[in-house]
Amino acid sequence: MRRVQTHFLVLLIHFLSAGLHFLSVEAAPAGDEITYLPGLSKQPSFKHYSGYLDLATGKHLHYWFVESQGKPSSDPLVLWLNGGPGCSSLDGLLTEHGPYLIQDDGASLDYNPYSWNKIANVLYLESPAGVGFSYSDNKNYKTNDTEVALNNYLALKTFLKLFPEYASNAVFLTGESYGGIYIPTLAQRVMEDSAINLQGVAVGNGMSSYELNDNSLVFFAYYHGLLGTELWAGLQAYCCDQGRCNFYDNRNPNCSELLGDVQTIVYSSGLNMYNLYSPCAGGVKDTLRSVQCSSNATLVLTVYSSTVLLKHVMVSCRGRLIYRHKYSYLQKYRVLVYNGDVDMACNFMGDEWFVESLKQLVQVQRRVWLYEGADGKQVGGFVKEFSNIAFLTIKGSGHMVPTDKPAAAFTMFSRFIRREPY
């Protein structure tokens, strides 16, 4: 997994500040074109832009757009949103699937052979206002999922006005983590606008349901050898009844105490919750506190999984009841739900349960899928296809799939937007 040094954010600000220095704030897209990007030994052959999408709501969302290296005029337009909520989508650009990636020296960029803009025009949007370089006129950054969906929709409409040459291109909405909320809520608005050629949505390691994520995490932890038989027996005794377990909002005090032990093991024992089998950047501290190990010392992602930890900000069943409803609107679109299978922040089992809860007809039974690796064809993971939704795992990957498994991720992405069998 790519390692980014602790001065990543400082360098990122340097890149953006330097890049924006070359821009005019008066015109777009020509005024937003990046003519020189520090850190690259050779400037790209494709066009790329950075600027603001100014919304009538008083929000100004920063974007970075990279044209396709293939056929920009006909290749799809892909919108990418990182999660959090509160993580910059420049994480996706500069550490996951963008055309240039931050290198270990923290001072240079190098081209990514598995960049998603090899075959698509990709729009990275910093959302909501307050994230990254995005801001609000009234300085009020309190928001909710409904408002964020509206502003993301308005941002996409504004982008298509500034770049009318892409107005008829196929559009795919994609995201990661809390993108499991952002993307379906945005898609519901976009699908009501016939002027946007929406073709599909994809979510990686998404937060689709707090309840299912919490319940599945305990099973994940036990079957990956984290809990031990004594703790597991206690959980079965106090949190389960007739084979059904409630690790989400169980009011049994003995169950709650044991779930606290699970929380400590998963989040505070020195494990990397974003990739169970990856080391912690900077190493595990001698004295462990309630600070989560991160796969990147400066890439801070929000913890979703523990009701014990976050019960004061969660509303029971809200995710499952409302956002399952959002997915039901997408029946005529191609939908991909994919998960790195060693992520503990948004584990694969919870998302698989979520997809199955939609009760769609199974079209293709669970099977392996393959990609071309350095040593020939390799197993990328497993895939199960329903009426219009595919659930796909990426073997050995954590939360940020394109970072951990770039070749497999590119193959998956290519098949998704090209409507090829996985």
Summary of predicted features, one role per range:
Residues 1-422:
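Terminal and linker regions of secretory-pathway proteins
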